[in-house]
Amino acid sequence: MEESQYKQEHNKKVAQDEGQEDKDTIFETIEAIEAKLMELKTNPESTFNYGIFPEVYMNQGEEILYPAWSLKEENLFQTFKSLRLFQKLCPRGSGNLVKKSWYPCVPEEGGHIINIQDLFGPNIGTQKEPQLVIIEGAAGIGKSTLARQVKRAWMEGELYRDHFQHVFFFSCRELAQCKKLSLAELITQGQDVPTAPINQILSHPEKLLFILDGIDEPAWVLADQNPELCLYWSQTQPVHTLLGSLLGKSILPEASFLLTTRTTALQKFIPSLPQSCQVEVLGFSDFEQEIYIYKYFAKQIFGIKALMMVESNPVLLTLCEVPWVCWLVCNCLKKQMEQGGDVSLTSQTTTAICLKYISLTIPVHHMRTQLRALCSLAAEGIWKRRTLFSESDLCKQGLDEDAVAIFLKTGVLQKQASSLSYSFAHLCLQEFFASMSCILEDSEERHGDMEMDRIVETLVERYGRQNLFEAPTVRFLFGLLSKEGLKEMEKLFSCSLPGKTKLKLLWHILGKSQPHQPPCLGLLHCLYENQDMKLLTHVMHDLQGTIVPDTDDITHTVLQTNVKHLVVRTDMELMVVTFCIQFCSHMRSLQLNMEGQQGYALTAPRMVLYRWTPITNASWKILFYNLKFNSNLEGLDLSGNPLSYSAVQYLCDAMIYPGCQLKTLWLVECGLTPTYCSLLASVLSACSSLRELDLQLNDLCDDGVRMLCEGLRNRACNLRILRLDLYSLSAQVITELRTLEENNLKLHISSIWMPQMMVPTENMDEEDILTSFKQQRQQSGANPMEILGTEEDFWGPIGPVATEVVYRERNLYRVQLPMAGSYHCPSTRLHFVVTRAVTIEIEFCAWSQFLDKTPLQQSHMVVGPLFDIKAEQGAVTAVYLPHFVSLKDTKASTFDFKVAHFQEHGMVLETPDRVKPGYTVLKNPSFSPMGVVLRIIPAARHFIPITSITLIYYRVNQEEVTLHLYLVPNDCTIQKAIDDEEMKFQFVRINKPPPVDNLFIGSRYIVSGSENLEITPKELELCYRSSKEFQLFSEIYVGNMGSEIKLQIKNKKHMKLIWEALLKPGDLRPALPRIAQALKDAPSLLHFMDQHREQLVARVTSVDPLLDKLHGLVLNEESYEAVRAENTNQDKMRKLFNLSRSWSRACKDLFYQALKETHPHLVMDLLEKSGGVSLGS
């Protein structure tokens, strides 16, 4: 069975398998939508002020997605403000830096996501406000709607009101109908209602904004030919000359412009185009897409049904990222619901959706001739760059009045209110009909190759060779010439369209593309629309040769390489690329790097995808959906990308699918927690192809690794290499791992954690240093068990660096970083990048000490711990400050994050250089009490998703167990304050995994558990309280804990389970005796090994068994042999103690455990003599 057919049949099963999960997600989404709509009624300015949530209007006077449609034909009228906007970094004289081709070297960073209110904001580099903003984007992505929204928002006082006094909107397709205009007439035409005399308007040109929508649509060249003729605002000029003079700054040079266009190659249309700010529209945000689908339908039940259907189909969900396609999908579903039959949509391409739309909308059986005429009209307009047609144009093509009336009623055509002209509902729709015309014109055999040549030459003349595959008309042609496309067209037009003949047309188009052109996203889009296996295999095979650089990019040299680099900014691009590489037999590995990080090098021939925009659950869903069918792919590297629980679920589902043959999986630094390990363990048991799994730099803890061990014990597991952070595991778990290795000689468990020394140079920023450090660490071949540390240590180029306690009561600590490099502390989540050896002091502070003196709480929300850091000036080139906002789920912009500095003269808010999941990055920082805050509106405080932790403490009193359960934001200063408070009353913490889902401040949760538990109170509120304040908790009385108990936390509103833990009697270790106050004030506490050094040297009689237990854990081969070489037991112990000077506390804990196993009576005797206090494990 062909793979494309196989995938189509599989779609139904996907919908069933994911149905229940999607239902849960849908109802959560609906509640969020309804809550947002309620908020908008009370605070309509919220979106523009802060850009966190989309806005939906449902009033009759508002415009729909494509405002020229008759309002009477629709029951929903929306505008949307949460289109994703990507500002490109394009220096003067450069081309488009965000490449759309494969290259043999790493692409430069292309830009960042911005909000609509930032369009005319200061440039990050120059801090100058742009006068020209170019809005570009794919067909149907929402450029025109965005332009109209800017005008409307300005009129309503929500946007740029202080920036501009007058805003003029022009549709270039309509403007091109005017032959001549004066500047005064142009301004009058751009206003809904005249607001002031022309001389008053022109008196402040710096306060004028001209919006030109669709600047590339008309066939004109806007050259500034005769600037001296445009000095008089009352003198008429050809429209293209007038616009060219405006854009060329010959007249009104201080005025600002906003242009929308499909292409960035505007120099051929506007030769005198000045330096601009380029912003690309990437389509719907996830939340906006859900709102649009849900609110499209008048009845809520239909909206829910449509949303569930789209969410259950990863391909359809991705296609709906484009607003125009989303409208087509909703329209098709609405027609099916109205007709009362089965409601289903299995279309995999935009072309297939368009064909479905026509079959449901137009009564084709009675209108085949008229439909052909409509296609001819569309084609003529495309070739001549016309989108408006007169009645005579329609008659010339043979369209009668009845047919025009039907096309108007169905919404395919629309009549312009301001004139007697007609247009297609959307330019994309006109291009689709034009593509059908090409095929119909070529359907008569008498034309043969000559007709094909004529069609292809027309396409090349219209779009150019270099941009041929970017044109929607060409992409639709590829889709229509597919097997399914031709079959549907034959039904529509009741004619025969021989497949072999049509295939020739495709090869004609491919042959006319620019020779030696690099493989580009446009070509991949065309191949995706066609989905023919033979064509895909042939073309993708040809693309594996030499990659030639863009002629405008002198930094990319011609290289033969086995690595292909490509930037993907949207889920649509991600879907297209991952679909096409299935047919690249030589492409064995795939690597996805977020925000340009280098990742961890896989050696097989691979493709590296770069993503400068946030990766959402929808992104992971389509990526792993395509992964199911890629039998060629053997390696997948997702290192450095934070993965949600849902994302790991999608990954694991893909890996156990029969078509997936993945052998190597790298998930280094992906934010994995113990909860994820049950999913990974199931993969180890079910995925027989997996040979290598790297899970380093994740907080898996003992519980997570134990789950992995269950999967490793399964006979179906064929894993050969497992990499883990062994330094953070207990001796018992490490022993369990060693036992697994002994029982399975093919399995190797390690932790590559010893990089070579790396000294940063002046040319490396903090990202380069961090990347280099990671790569060196990964490439090292050192024994992983030679170095162990704790979560309180700072991990750097040479391993762990101990943190010293300076003043315990003040929570003041000191760390002496020994050399240049990047250092990370797992417990505080602080990162430092330093250029030389430096001593850093860190004090935990309470926000309440500083916030009460400022109005910050009204406009900002605390989203991270507050530290007072002191370091030598210039030694620290970057600091990573932790925050607990979930970037993958929040609607907040990264520009809303600020670092609050509390200095002697007051508070300063600094914009971080970068915002990453869990961190904000400051380059060349100055230090003072500092922490991360988020700019919000008060009503949005409860809509910010955060990461949280659960803390469980227990105390055993006369065999009765009492538990304290906390639910707090992931803030180390709060955790430390709770630890200290609980320790006063001899409560001991039990480590359990945190909640998987993101939670919301102010939400309430119900605590429950096994029978016979007394819980007070049963309700907990998740709130942020300063570390100096009392934290909320539930007290749980267990009684005599003879068996395991289960604890659960559920959302009070939905009763959805958000966390559960199983407590076993073995989790309760005897509490340590209270330590004297004098000891508490000491800088550090003596370990059992150091307390009893003299006794241990004298009384350990069997040293070799002790050494055997330490071999591979604490002692490497050289150290092991050096100790054994000593003559007497006393000398061996002295040698061992000499080596222990460099050991961390974790290493000493392992020594203590080994000593208890080999000399239990000696350990008990020493404990009794010291009063029973042991500071070993």
From Swiss-Prot:
Residues covered by the NACHT domain: 131-440
Region (Disordered): 1-20
Annotated stretches, region: UPA: 928-1077
Enzyme nomenclature, EC number: 3.4.-.-
Keyword Transit peptide: no
Residues in LRR repeats: 632-652, 689-709
SMART domains with a match to the protein in the record: LRR_RI (SM00368)
Tissues in which the protein is found: Widely expressed, including in macrophages and, at lower levels, in the peripheral nervous system, including in the sciatic nerve, Schwann cells, sensory neurons and motor neurons.
SUPFAM superfamilies: DEATH domain, P-loop containing nucleoside triphosphate hydrolases, RNI-like
InterPro entries: CARD, CARD8/ASC/NALP1_CARD, DEATH-like_dom_sf, FIIND_dom, Leu-rich_rpt, LRR_dom_sf, NACHT_NTPase, NLRP_HD2
Main location as per UniProt: cytoplasm
Binding-site positions, ATP: G137, A138, A139, G140, I141, G142, K143, S144
Subunit relationships: Interacts with DPP9; leading to inhibit activation of the inflammasome. DPP9 acts via formation of a ternary complex, composed of a DPP9 homodimer, one full-length Nlrp1b protein, and one cleaved C-terminus of Nlrp1b (NACHT, LRR and PYD domains-containing protein 1b, C-terminus). Interacts with DPP8; leading to inhibit activation of the inflammasome, probably via formation of a ternary complex with DPP8. Interacts (via LRR repeats) with BCL2 and BCL2L1 (via the loop between motifs BH4 and BH3). Interacts with NOD2; this interaction may increase IL1B release.
Record's comment describing the protein's domains: The CARD domain is involved in the interaction with CASP1 and CASP4/CASP11. The leucine-rich repeat (LRR) domain may be involved in autoinhibition in the absence of activating signal, possibly through intramolecular interaction with the NACHT domain.
Protein name: NACHT, LRR and PYD domains-containing protein 1b allele 2
